[in-house]
Amino acid sequence: MQTQKIRIRLKAYDYALIDRSAQEIVETAKRTGAVVKGPIPLPTKIERFNILRSPHMNKTSREQLEIRTHLRLMDIVDWTDKTTDALMKLDLPAGVDVEIKVQ
């Protein structure tokens, strides 16, 4: 039994994609006998941009855009070598950024 834990942080623009990826990671870790805490949804980061609609005049007419970045956090406790091998072989979608730390 190890005292270290694996912390996985997922980041994506599409919430459905990140939830599916988090579920795959949880199922894979539980299949190998590890204990998983999470996925914990972290606050969504919202970036807003104001862009002029007209190239010359009409400063009052603007387009408002936003980008939402969804975050999920998971801790894998009591992991084994089988768990790390299974997580390394896991194929996640291209729109999900995965950050893994061993603490």
UniProtKB/Swiss-Prot annotation:
Gene3D superfamilies, per the entry: Ribosomal protein S10 domain
User: One MF term from GO for this chain?
Assistant: structural constituent of ribosome
Q: Name one GO biological process term.
A: translation
Paired cysteines (S-S): none
Keywords tagged on the record: Ribonucleoprotein, Ribosomal protein
Q: Which domain of life is it from?
A: Bacteria
Q: What does this protein do?
A: Involved in the binding of tRNA to the ribosomes.
Known PANTHER family for this protein? Answer: 30S RIBOSOMAL PROTEIN S10 FAMILY MEMBER (PTHR11700)
Q: What is this protein called?
A: Small ribosomal subunit protein uS10
